[in-house]
Curated annotation (Swiss-Prot):
Membrane topology: Single-pass type I membrane protein
Origin species: Bos taurus
Function field: Part of the TCR-CD3 complex present on T-lymphocyte cell surface that plays an essential role in adaptive immune response. When antigen presenting cells (APCs) activate T-cell receptor (TCR), TCR-mediated signals are transmitted across the cell membrane by the CD3 chains CD3D, CD3E, CD3G and CD3Z. All CD3 chains contain immunoreceptor tyrosine-based activation motifs (ITAMs) in their cytoplasmic domain. Upon TCR engagement, these motifs become phosphorylated by Src family protein tyrosine kinases LCK and FYN, resulting in the activation of downstream signaling pathways.
PANTHER family xrefs: T-CELL SURFACE GLYCOPROTEIN CD3 GAMMA CHAIN, T-CELL SURFACE GLYCOPROTEIN CD3 GAMMA CHAIN / DELTA CHAIN
Domain notes: A di-leucine motif and a tyrosine-based motif are individually sufficient to induce both endocytosis and delivery to lysosomes.
Glycan attachment sites: N45, N88
ITAM domain boundaries: 145-173
Principal location class: membrane
SMART domains reported in the protein's UniProt record: IGc2 (SM00408), ITAM (SM00077)
Keyword annotations: Adaptive immunity, Cell membrane, Disulfide bond, Glycoprotein, Immunity, Immunoglobulin domain, Membrane, Phosphoprotein, Receptor, Signal, Transmembrane, Transmembrane helix
Residue spans, topological domain Extracellular: 23-111
PTM annotation, UniProt: Phosphorylated on Tyr residues after T-cell receptor triggering by LCK in association with CD4/CD8. Phosphorylated also by PKC; leading to the TCR complex down-regulation. Phosphorylated on Tyr residues after T-cell receptor triggering by LCK in association with CD4/CD8.
Domain of life, source organism: Eukaryota
UniProt protein name: T-cell surface glycoprotein CD3 gamma chain
Amino acid sequence: MEQGKHLAGLILAVFLLQGTMAHVKEVKVDDNREDGSVILICVTNDTTITWLKDVEQIGSGDTKKNTWNLGSSTKDPRGIYKCEGSNNQSKSLQIYYRMCQNCIELNPSTVAGFIFTEIVSIFLLAVGVYFIAGQEGVRQSRASDKQTLLNNDQLYQPLKEREDDQYSHLRKN
């Protein structure tokens, strides 16, 4: 019973690996050039090669060298590239150059995120201003709020004779 499981596992492994062992062309990248250009190299023995970018044919390259020049790396040659021979089998290679480390790619979801964040921040700022402005501040005193300290609008209160009251404690002779 134990040998039957191992045999079934071996047959399954051979069957599944059959597709990966088939000869599939590879695409390599050469971007260490002095002029800054990016060159794709198709590793195959076919003489006729068709180059594809994002499933669209971009042309036939140099069949002697099996290469395709993408141009300068500063022009951002991004995409999924394939080289196909006569049997139309190829591995795809995704190329993505990001020249700016601090740049933001403006796709629709990024723009929507910026707009949503802006609306939320303006709303929160408006709510904050509303609550701060709505608070009661220091009230202005009214005439009815004043306490009468001296009767009949007296400006000064006369001191009693020979009594200095509180001023006598400040100065000592």
